């Protein structure tokens, strides 16, 4: 008896569907329609924001979120640069190259981009968006980094934030980032390791390690 091949499809939830609630949620958190995310989507979707789900046999097992740099939730700037906010495939769906399938969906969708950028972490306690993963699995390279620590939790642990770059053309100019702005964290995604909690009164939730006595 021939084994049934898995049914795989990729769906863009920014175009409206039964999965549209995924604009406000991901695998790391339950559905929460928080205000900062709503405000961000109102600005970003008209400028080219995309969130796509990978559905395996009618179950959501992966996602990717990307946007032109000028509408990114990260302080990254660049000419015709696409910023990947996140990419994720559930562990139970590993081993089928589904992450690469999602990634190539972005590359194909944005073939005219000069290149692709993202942020990656090294020595951070979160397993998400690791530098080695971005390099080994998708071909990104680190073009700049800074070593910081969190001012609200795990305060003794330093980790690195890397600006990652994947040029799409030989003459592409690499992106730039605002390190000072990034010390404030990000507020467009509750699940992101660099998330700035709305309730904190501190403007900057990270500080550079070398500045600490």
Question: Could you describe each region identified by the protein language model?
Answer:
Residues 110-127:
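Conserved GNAT acetyl-CoA-binding A-motif
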Residues 122-149:
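Conserved active-site alpha-helix within GNAT-family acetyltransferase domains
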Residues 89, 95-108:
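Conserved acetyl-CoA-binding loop-helix of GNAT-fold acetyltransferases
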Residues 1-47, 51-53, 189, 193-201, ...:
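Short amphipathic alpha-helix that is part of the acyltransferase structural core
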Residues 33-58, 62-82, 87:
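A conserved beta-strand-loop-helix scaffold within acyl/acetyltransferase catalytic domains
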């Amino acid at each position: 008896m021939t084994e049934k091949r898995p049914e795989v499809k990729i769906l863009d939830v920014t175009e409206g569907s039964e999965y549209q609630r995924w604009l406000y949620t991901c695998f790391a958190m339950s559905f929460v329609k928080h205000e900062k995310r709503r405000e961000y989507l109102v600005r970003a979707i008209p400028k080219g924001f995309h969130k796509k789900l990978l559905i395996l046999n009618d179950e959501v097992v992966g996602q990717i979120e990307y946007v032109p740099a000028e509408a990114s939730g990260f302080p990254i700037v660049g000419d015709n640069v696409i910023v990947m906010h996140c990419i994720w495939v559930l562990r139970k769906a590993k081993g089928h190259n589904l992450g690469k399938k999602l990634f190539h969906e972005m590359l194909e969708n944005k073939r005219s981009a000069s290149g692709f950028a993202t942020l990656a972490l090294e020595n951070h306690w979160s397993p998400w968006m690791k530098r080695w993963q971005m390099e080994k699995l998708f071909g990104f390279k680190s073009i700049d980094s800074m070593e910081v620590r969190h001012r609200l939790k795990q305060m003794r642990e330093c980790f690195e934030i890397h600006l990652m770059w994947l040029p799409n053309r030989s003459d592409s100019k690499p992106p730039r980032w605002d390190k000072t702005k990034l010390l404030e964290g990000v507020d467009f995604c509750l699940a992101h390791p660099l998330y700035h909690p709305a309730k904190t009164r501190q403007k900057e939730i990270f500080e550079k390690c070398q500045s600490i006595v």
